Amino acid sequence: MPSEKTFKQRRSFEQRVEDVRLIREQHPTKIPVIIERYKGEKQLPVLDKTKFLVPDHVNMSELIKIIRRRLQLNANQAFFLLVNGHSMVSVSTPISEVYESERDEDGFLYMVYASQETFGTAMAV
């Protein structure tokens, strides 16, 4: 069973800043993204990992397809993805644009997923 602690709870701010610095140095065309299951989610499984390096040209719809595939969801299973726990993002938006406007002060871009709109406005795909 994966840890119940969030990525931010498992790694100090300084560790996360250093992680991003190394990632951006070694992979300048990749966006460091943390994707975690919404804390109240019961239906969707937990991802096998939370840290993703996403090519900067990928748009949100491609990222959603990747996550749905990793979760092994079928076509009729609901899936909502929120950036920073609150922001709806157009599926055609490149991840690089989302990163520029929504990245955390530690340098990571944080997203949560759930099977319902339990947290207000969400993006259904």
From Swiss-Prot:
GO cellular component terms listed in the entry, alphabetical order: autolysosome; autophagosome; autophagosome membrane; axoneme; cytoplasmic vesicle; endomembrane system; membrane; microtubule
A Pfam family this chain is assigned to: ATG8
Protein name: Microtubule-associated protein 1 light chain 3 beta
Organism of this sequence: Mus musculus
Membrane topology, as annotated: Lipid-anchor
Record lipid sites (Phosphatidylserine amidated glycine): G120
Propeptide: 121-125
Keywords, sorted A to Z: Autophagy, Cytoplasm, Cytoplasmic vesicle, Cytoskeleton, Lipoprotein, Membrane, Microtubule, Mitochondrion, Phosphoprotein, Ubl conjugation, Ubl conjugation pathway
